[in-house]
Amino acid sequence: MSPVLEPAREYPSLDTFRLSELEAVRLVLRGGSVIDWHRLNFESREEAYGLLRAQEFDLSDSDDLERIEKIKQDAIAYLRRNFDFPVPKPVANADICDLLMMASGRGHRQLCACTILKVMHIIHHLEARELLFMLPTSDQEVFHMVEQKVYRVVGWMLSSGFPIVEFIGGRKNKDSLYTKLLAKQKNIAAQIYDKLRFRVITRSSDDIFPTLAYLMRHVFPFNYVIPGESKNNILSFRRFCESHEHLRTLLPRLQIAEDIERDSMPDDNTFTSGNYRVVHFVVDM
């Protein structure tokens, strides 16, 4: 795990929202998958490094660098072995930040870099899940590490005066898990993702985008969002963006079809009140 760093006290502004941040927020709200993306939209190496930091990679740590390089080489080998996928030498030899920047560029190298990163994402995820089963580490220990990270970052947000009016965190008790399984059509315990949950209430709906962007910088990376598990019945992504001058200019540059959002998503939990308004998403950490 990377060293504990003090989160930035600068709160993201809608007036300076970057395209990469808007893409990430959109992904969270609709429960999309980065595998469906065609490109990244990082404008600087610092942005690229920020994604790595959110995944607990420390580029000053030789072990982390070795781990990243191993994942990259495994991804390239997979593509060559199964698809005879040509990877130019400059792409194959690029460090991880350069690879992320290539995926944000244009041309054949962009396509290659993006494809490699998608496979790296899958390999890293699968190997992490395997490691979780192999190591003598209990869920409680993992939960404790996640809680420490979340409480530390949200603590900085609260002390810095960010527009959060309420924060609640905790682990679901067994009764809550029983009820959730009873309410689900697919009542298998392995499909309960959100055993550790946090609730953040912002001052207004205008604060949702900046708060999500900040959390994705410091708590969880956008590519860890579980596809199909998001629910958003607070705001319409498109209408919200169209109502804000700067965000409106970014809309034509989004990479997924414009009509993919829904104004509201049905909630499969029959125990939830129809008046309950929430942006709900699940992250696999």
Per-range role (PLM):
Residues 188-190, 194-197, 201-285:
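Long beta-strand-rich cores associated with HINT superfamily self-processing modules
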Residues 1-180, 188-191:
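Charge-rich, low-complexity segments
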